[in-house]
Amino acid sequence: LDMGHMVNNIKQIDEFVNLGSNAIETDVSFDKKANPEYTYHGTPCDCGRDCLRWEYFNDFVKALRTATTPGNSKYDKLFLVVFDLKTSSLYDYQASEAGTKLAKNLLQHYWNNGNNGGRAYIILSIPNLKHYKLITGFQQTLKDEGHAELLDKVGYDFSGNDDIGDVQKTYEKAGVTGHVWQSDGITNCLLRGFTRINAAVANRDSANGIINKVYYWTVDKRQTTRDTLDANVDGIMTNYPDITVEILNEDAYKKKFRIATYEDNPWETFKE
């Protein structure tokens, strides 16, 4: 996956897809009552990026639905969206409520109440292991609303760079047994080693690991892109998706990697 980083403004959906992104990451901020309010990152953010682009969450999600509905020119290209849920503004006890409100919002504005809504896969990316009840609240709400089938399109990620063993235990608490993506990374302003990404890949490839896919962020330089592919990741999050496309076309990588499409299953671990 060539994942466009920090896509918080409706115009940027086109911009990143046109540069080659088949997935985007969008920041979601919450109000005091745990309602998803804006797609907004704020300062500080990645070097070389405008941190202040934003939309109302509902408006962004409706535009996303249009972009990922058959018949739209972007439909074939954009097949996965990571919602980077900025839950640090909430109290821990609000996590479940945030999950409920997010589910109701997406059900209405993205999935169109199950009636020919957006088709992209959705990843709920949560920065704090303590907020795992966001997942259970989200799942229960879709079940209560009679749309458990939409959970087939939803996956999970804890983005806090926690110990992989602790992440696995947290999923056990949440009752999650699949659809698990694992991120690792740091802002493009700083360098980060590959120790933890290697641990995540090892968990993915082991018989008893819970991880299905691994992605690394934020990768903007050509050499870092090569190093990341050499670590055998499934996704690269970047501010420059065209650089990822360029490197994937190099002889060393074009036989081993390709850009994923709707024919692929993002919850299935790739076996060589």
Swiss-Prot record:
Required cofactor(s): Mg(2+)
Entry EC no(s): 4.6.1.-
Subcellular location: Secreted
Cofactor note: Binds 1 Mg(2+) ion per subunit.
Keyword flag Lipid metabolism: yes
Tissues expressed in: Expressed by the venom gland.
Residues that bind Mg(2+): E25, D27, D84
GO biological process: killing of cells of another organism; lipid catabolic process
Alphabetical UniProt keywords: Cytolysis, Dermonecrotic toxin, Disulfide bond, Hemolysis, Lipid degradation, Lipid metabolism, Lyase, Magnesium, Metal-binding, Secreted, Toxin
Entry annotated with the keyword Nucleotide-binding: no
Signal peptide: none
Chemical reaction(s) catalysed: an N-(acyl)-sphingosylphosphocholine = an N-(acyl)-sphingosyl-1,3-cyclic phosphate + choline; an N-(acyl)-sphingosylphosphoethanolamine = an N-(acyl)-sphingosyl-1,3-cyclic phosphate + ethanolamine; a 1-acyl-sn-glycero-3-phosphocholine = a 1-acyl-sn-glycero-2,3-cyclic phosphate + choline; a 1-acyl-sn-glycero-3-phosphoethanolamine = a 1-acyl-sn-glycero-2,3-cyclic phosphate + ethanolamine
GO molecular function, one term: lyase activity
Disulphide bonds in the chain: C45-C51, C47-C189
Organism domain of life: Eukaryota
Active-site feature positions: H5, H41 (nucleophile)
Main location: secreted
A cellular component term, taken from the record's GO annotations: extracellular region
Function: Dermonecrotic toxins cleave the phosphodiester linkage between the phosphate and headgroup of certain phospholipids (sphingolipid and lysolipid substrates), forming an alcohol (often choline) and a cyclic phosphate. This toxin acts on sphingomyelin (SM). It may also act on ceramide phosphoethanolamine (CPE), lysophosphatidylcholine (LPC) and lysophosphatidylethanolamine (LPE), but not on lysophosphatidylserine (LPS), and lysophosphatidylglycerol (LPG). It acts by transphosphatidylation, releasing exclusively cyclic phosphate products as second products.
Family note: Belongs to the arthropod phospholipase D family. Class II subfamily.
The protein, known as: Dermonecrotic toxin LvSicTox-alphaIC1biv
